């Protein structure tokens, strides 16, 4: 056995077997129209106001916390800032789940980092597939809460774009009361702010809300997210977060983005994205290769195609990079399209328009069977 193999064998067994989250950048591509990561299509400009970098930053930069708290309508003690919402996902597992004993629960098709974070810490991943309309299966959730410490619900859901029914969210919070944390992932909430549940925090001590500056604030490269919760939970998370989660430049830019001017600019971007989303949704429905375009409350559209692999490759060859969702339960022949500029949306339609429609009844039949088979509860223990 080679020396390198010996070193690899020192790693934990679950890490050796782990399939990492395949981010858009990790998947690569050589395109010039990047519509696969739900980013804002244009760069934002900021000037650093702090030029002193020889000192460590604050663990929780006061200016950032206060500005986000004001934006969210919460007291500062209910806000924690982290390296993206992904770190918030991980912090909840680190704080609440005993490896090899506890579980998290989530409802696919949904965001993949819930599963990866649990795998990394040796925590069971318990899945309760969403119903055919992508709403929560409440009876199945109720029957699978043993040893569950954290329930993740994404609303608007990635990659489907739909909001979860508020009454169902309240039902899950009630089911989990005294048993589990319910983390509502609101990464895309700026595109439908009326649907936020942040005003529920006063009524549900087990509610946690995850937020980010990556989407509507157009700062995906900054890696800055927020966890909103009651102060007791925030204090627990502060015990497990890194001592300096935000660098000084990141905190500087985040504070600028959360200024009154920054928030006004964010809302202007949201209006532009909504207009382009409406245009793209209408145009997609006229393409022969498109079977269905699903309603979205976010900055992307999910569409089912007659032959998604051919469509994906055809656009890839033209420098238009989409996100393939075929491996997600219930999403056979589906691609997710980030809303880009109007020009980028027009390029997508120009590339799709010549592609033929195909009789895909067999594929849809198979899709229905697959969804039916996955409706039973699946458990994965790491």
From Swiss-Prot:
Gene3D superfamilies given in the database record: Aspartate Aminotransferase, domain 1, Type I PLP-dependent aspartate aminotransferase-like (Major domain)
Pathway named in the protein's UniProt entry: Amino-acid biosynthesis; L-histidine biosynthesis; L-histidine from 5-phospho-alpha-D-ribose 1-diphosphate: step 7/9
The protein's required cofactors: pyridoxal 5'-phosphate
Residue ranges, annotated region (Disordered): 360-382
A biological-process GO annotation: L-histidine biosynthetic process
Description of how the protein assembles with itself and partners: Homodimer.
Protein name (Swiss-Prot/TrEMBL): Histidinol-phosphate aminotransferase
Native source species: Yersinia pseudotuberculosis serotype IB (strain PB1/+)
Gene: hisC
